[in-house]
């Protein structure tokens, strides 16, 4: 038995989404038979392009994407360029590994009510919810779509900044979610998990020094 709505929208309170954007995202999902989740390009409050998708990386690439130095050194290897992502059925949108949780649409016809209830993991908060969702959909043979000819506005970090004022506190929360994701979704063994923990400890020290001592922000 399926839910009555054809689509469900999940969004943060700090986003601005037009009716035209919503209709365009729904259209992309409708045209993609195995498309389960979709969103649009993200822009900030100044209209500048912002982060709009992730690849579902291996654990080691994911770790490199965490370090402030390694992220810059290996930038070219850490994310597939938008134009190289597979095209969706509408000929415009792209298929991605994961979408930001600030705004996305779910096509309920892809799921039973039971599947839909289990779609979101309650053991993580603020970080890695999106990649966990991406992994679950991948296991189900379903796709996430990024509509590249529509956009919405997101005032990034407004919600989280109210609860976590120190960058190092946000980083700790990120690392906790990362390790949960590695263990339960990437199925890391004890030895690999220990290496990941050691790497993240170095990253946290780096963040504390750069933000606490040098007062840097990014």
Which stretches of residues belong to each language-model region?
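Short, high-confidence coil segments that cap the C-terminus of an alpha-helix
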Residues: 5, 33-35, 142
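Short aromatic/hydrophobic "clamp" motif used to bind/position activated sugar donors
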Residues: 8
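The conserved acidic donor/metal-binding loop of glycosyltransferases
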Residues: 12-16
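Conserved donor NDP-sugar-binding/catalytic core segment of glycosyltransferases
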Residues: 18-56
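A short, conserved alpha-helix in the catalytic core of glycosyltransferases
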Residues: 89-151
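Active-site-adjacent helix/loop segment of glycosyltransferases
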Residues: 134-216
């Amino acid at each position: 038995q399926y839910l009555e709505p054809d689509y469900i929208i999940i969004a943060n309170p700090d986003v601005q989404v037009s009716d035209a954007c919503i209709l365009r995202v729904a259209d992309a999902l409708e045209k993609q038979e195995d498309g389960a989740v979709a969103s649009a390009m993200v822009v900030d409050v100044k209209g500048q392009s912002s982060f709009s998708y992730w690849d579902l990386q291996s654990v080691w690439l994911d770790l490199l994407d965490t370090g402030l130095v390694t992220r810059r050194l290996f930038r070219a290897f850490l994310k597939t360029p938008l134009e190289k992502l597979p095209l969706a059925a509408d000929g415009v949108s792209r298929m991605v590994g994961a979408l930001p949780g600030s705004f996305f649409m779910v096509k309920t016809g892809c799921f039973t009510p039971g599947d839909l209830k289990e779609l979101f993991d309650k053991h993580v908060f603020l970080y890695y919810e999106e990649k966990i969702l991406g992994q679950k959909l991948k296991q189900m043979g379903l796709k996430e779509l990024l509509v590249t000819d529509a956009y919405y506005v997101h005032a990034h970090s407004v919600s989280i900044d109210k609860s976590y004022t120190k960058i190092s506190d946000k980083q700790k929360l990120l690392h906790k979610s990362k390790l949960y994701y590695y263990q339960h979704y990437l199925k890391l063994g004890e030895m690999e998990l220990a290496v990941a923990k050691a790497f993240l400890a170095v990253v946290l020290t780096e963040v504390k020094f750069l933000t606490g001592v040098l007062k840097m922000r990014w």
